[in-house]
Amino acid sequence: MVRFENGIPRALFMSEHAGGQAFAWSALEKFQTRTADNETIERPVLYSAIGSHAMYAVPGNHPYVLPFGMLKDVTDRGPLWDPALNTYAYFYDYVADRDSGGTNLTSLTPAASNPEAPTSWFHFAGPWGDELYALRDMRQWRLFEQYHYITGPLGPKFKNLDRMNVCQTEHCTLLYSIEAGKKAVWYD
């Protein structure tokens, strides 16, 4: 989630399993690109975990839940992808959604740049991704009742999109450097 103030990006929250990290916009690694009008702009570089929904500010190993890096996400520099080149834009009326008890299926509307973009995905109330793999599945393992592969998270509609802070939860530290992010824990 990007937090804007007067149209200027100020902070970014990256989801990491049950938690995540929030960084000041100025702290993030950036790459320069050009718009269709040949304007130079900067976009943040995020690292997507292999086989996971988690996002990180740096490449490498990212342990979570279990000690000694036994359960970790792995990221690397991989191919650079600019999501702005193939993205859909939307407007979300969280007040209308909240007042209807979450049943207002018109609370998400496509932007003028993509008026035919689908919206039904947003209202899906189940978990995204795989279900918890059984222990008999050769990819699955557990230690101290913590499974390596678990059922995916709920979608963006259920991520407190009407929140005042950039983080999903009240407990949040806005980080002002990548180094501070390396020292922080995943559940901050």
Language-model segments: which ranges?
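Domain-length functional cores that host ligand/cofactor binding and catalytic or interaction surfaces
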Residues: 1-188
